[in-house]
């Protein structure tokens, strides 16, 4: 999956918006693209690297996903009880990544 496909997928959800919320923290050294629904973030990734995404996840599913896939790692600067990072082009199929991104959107949309 490439960055354009992933961005288009995240923006395909009703009410989804994209923003670059972390500019002031990294002073232009890193650029993150984040996706929101109802003003709340459900996914983000570093634009320059595009090596992983961070998404909200059902707490009951995190341990199972971590055991099943090496590509599931603790998130950077998010609560690991509710968020995971998924490395792209690793052992998790794109179809499963998309399912989890969709699930993240649904979790956040209901908040």
What are these regions (language model features)?
Residues 1-111:
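Charge-dense, helix-prone N-terminal extensions
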